[in-house]
Amino acid sequence: GIQQFWVVFFLFFMTGIAIVLYLNQTPSQPRERDYAYAGSFYAFAIWIGMGVAGIIRLLQHYAKMKELPAAAIVSVACLFVPIQMASQTWDDHDRSGRYVARDFGQNYLMSLQETGNPIIYTNGDNDTFPLWYNQETEGFRTDARTCNLSYLQTDWYIDQMKRPAYDSPSLPITWDRMEYVEGTNEYVPVRPEYKKSIDALYAEAEKQALSGNTEALVNVKKEFGENPYELKNILKYWIRSKNEDLKVIPTDSIVMKVDKEAVRRSGMMIPGDSIPDYMHISLKGKRALYKSELMMLEMLAEANWERPIYIAVSVGPENQLNMGNHFIQEGLTYRFTPFDTDKLGVKIDSEKMYDNLMHKFKFGGIDKPGIYIDENAMRMCHSHRRIFSQLAQQLIREGKKDKAKAALDYAEKMIPAFNVPYDWQNGAVQMAEAYYQLGDSTKADDMMKVLADKAVEYLTWYLSMDDNRFSISTREFEYHWAVLDAEVKIMKKYNSKLAEIYAPKVEELYNLYAERYERLQKMEKK
């Protein structure tokens, strides 16, 4: 009856739509939120069952059928609905033979040093949960600690990080809970304008000390430390100060004294012929550091290079604390080092990275034909292909051509194009260029042809659109045209015969675009 309808209706409404209204979900969610409607699916299933009973009654009433035959016919007919759904979408949901979540999570952990209880900073779901699964369920690399920077802004998560977990000791955080409890030190302003006054204060104190009066110098060093811009002193005398007026960072260029012996013992690659006395951390462009960033500085200061600290390659620059110029890549991770790797021109530890990629990494079955790879897994496949291309280029620069060729061939074997198509943005172009540099023009040409054909296909498709669709797709056309043009330049650079085929297409397609674009502009003015 109508009463039962309203019971099911409100179950349907309150377990789905009402939850979304209550949570006030913002538009453009990072992923589909189907699980918010899980309860509604149960309620709708009740309606489906009631609907089947209703169809049976209709057959009894209008077709004058008995209950059992009517029920049998309706049941068989209704079975075609899930069968049809399964036949059309089974392949989109079939994960059999695919273990990328587990294996790629292990690859992050295998990119860490095997000793020293390393720390890895992550940020998003897809570079955190697979690591947690491997550590919590598989018992893999329980000596390492995964630290999610998104959660590090909260007091409860810092509490967790200060406790040991499995074979990993607590993270090197010395702050008392009252210093990071919610509402405290949520952010600390960066005030480089203070530097002038502080420099003047130290200069005056040193001047008095030269005259025999050392009291002022003793007091100022007692207040702000030997060097007020050194990381440990900033943490101690400014950020953690009891004086609220001093809870600032008085410079946008922090220095950190380097324990050279600890660096030598750490196991990190030492580029160049010396270890710097100080590490420089630039905060230029930042007006404040948030709690998670303060914790990163605290751990860097307290670890003192004795505990390896890494950050996942999937963490964006906005969460790297402007320290990208101190990173050395060892796989799917960047390692924090005291070196300015930009100035030294060394961004990759090729020996460690080669060992990790060639001997330790797993690929979750993506080398097998027919494996279904959704967009999330595909992004990680792209990341793996990119790091292979980066490794190959570094090995070529170091003159290790045999290893570079082996790395490229292994990437082709484990990340094949039939499952992970070549694309301008996923490292395929860099791999093709590396093959050219290694003298394997046949393989390079094969890759470049696929890439160029893909660009031509897109450009031809845009030109086939009607005027309305074409006018809103001009930016995409220009992107793919720029891609094709760049690919042709690479072909010409390495004297590939493919240039003779695709160079005319670059000009031809652009002329067609320019003519049509100009015509549309004139039509708009009219």
Outline where the language-model segments fall.
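ER/secretory pathway lumenal C-terminal domains and tails of membrane proteins involved
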Residues: 1-37, 44-117, 129-526
